[in-house]
Amino acid sequence: MSAKIISGTEIRKEILGEIKDAVTEMKDKYGTVPGLVTILVGESPASMSYVSLKIKTALSLGFYEVQESLSVETTEAELLALIEKYNNDDSIHGVLVQLPLPKHINEQNIITAIDPDKDVDAFHPVNIGRLMIGGDDVKFLPCTPAGIQEMLVRSGVETAGAEVVVVGRSNIVGKPIAMMMAQKGIGANATVTIVHTGSRDLATHCRRADILIVAAGVPNLVKPEWIKPGATVIDVGVNRVGTNSETGKAILRGDVDFEAVKEIAGKITPVPGGVGPMTIAMLMKNTLASALAHSS
């Protein structure tokens, strides 16, 4: 029997509907709406497309949205000055700088320049520290890990006491989702193992998992024989493996051999249509949370 598909597209619709209702309520109560500035440096097609989607989503929810499109020759000092401007702008509740940046700009300097209380990507060291502490100290959750946790909760996956194996140790996905799953709370309380390129016998670790979260960036890395029967498999990978000759669009594959693994797993996310749609939804949720914190 094939696994149940966890659709990030459908869950995203639910979340955006809830956010839109909350924005209407906020406007009625406080006379303001969430404000988000998106800052893009250069003309990378992938970054331009992603920023465009973020802007479109924000506007559809009734946010106040400001777009700053800067030349690839913009200096680090100029970018820092622009961030400072929006840090001090009370109409802006979220400051988002699209990564990656041109090589002459130090990304960490830019991330740390953003006001932690407007850091809706949750990349600032202060927000990473708050995540480590947990509880009421957490203002924002990193967007992709938050999307994963939301998918687990809304699809009825029991996490308390579960064996969770995270494949990948990036600062954006692997480390934060492992930390979040180990915390006390809803969608957490799990026993977590992180595995990576330096781990021995990857398959053995994966076979222990009640919940397997794969963020390795290697297409079709995880095979069906790595899966515990009935496990929940969350595939974070988005790998371009070619181009469709008829449509000209990229062919995407996850880190999991989806067709084979779905015959073993109990629940599984597809690529595309799984974790991907959740990331922007959680960015909007963070921006709303920031706006409410600044307004109340």
Curated annotation (Swiss-Prot):
Pfam families hit by this protein: THF_DHG_CYH, THF_DHG_CYH_C
Keywords: Amino-acid biosynthesis, Histidine biosynthesis, Hydrolase, Methionine biosynthesis, Multifunctional enzyme, NADP, One-carbon metabolism, Oxidoreductase, Purine biosynthesis
Domain of life of the source: Bacteria
A GO biological process held by the record: methionine biosynthetic process
Binding site for NADP(+): 168-170, 197, 238
Record's catalysed reaction(s): (6R)-5,10-methylene-5,6,7,8-tetrahydrofolate + NADP(+) = (6R)-5,10-methenyltetrahydrofolate + NADPH; (6R)-5,10-methenyltetrahydrofolate + H2O = (6R)-10-formyltetrahydrofolate + H(+)
Cited InterPro entries: Aminoacid_DH-like_N_sf (IPR046346), NAD(P)-bd_dom_sf (IPR036291), THF_DH/CycHdrlase (IPR000672), THF_DH/CycHdrlase_cat_dom (IPR020630), THF_DH/CycHdrlase_CS (IPR020867), THF_DH/CycHdrlase_NAD-bd_dom (IPR020631)
Disulphide bridges: none
Pathway: One-carbon metabolism; tetrahydrofolate interconversion
Example of a GO MF term: methylenetetrahydrofolate dehydrogenase (NADP+) activity
EC code: 1.5.1.5, 3.5.4.9
Matching Gene3D superfamilies: Leucine Dehydrogenase, chain A, domain 1, NAD(P)-binding Rossmann-like Domain
GO cellular component assignments: cytosol
Binding partners and assembly: Homodimer.
Biological function: Catalyzes the oxidation of 5,10-methylenetetrahydrofolate to 5,10-methenyltetrahydrofolate and then the hydrolysis of 5,10-methenyltetrahydrofolate to 10-formyltetrahydrofolate.
Name of the protein in question: Bifunctional protein FolD
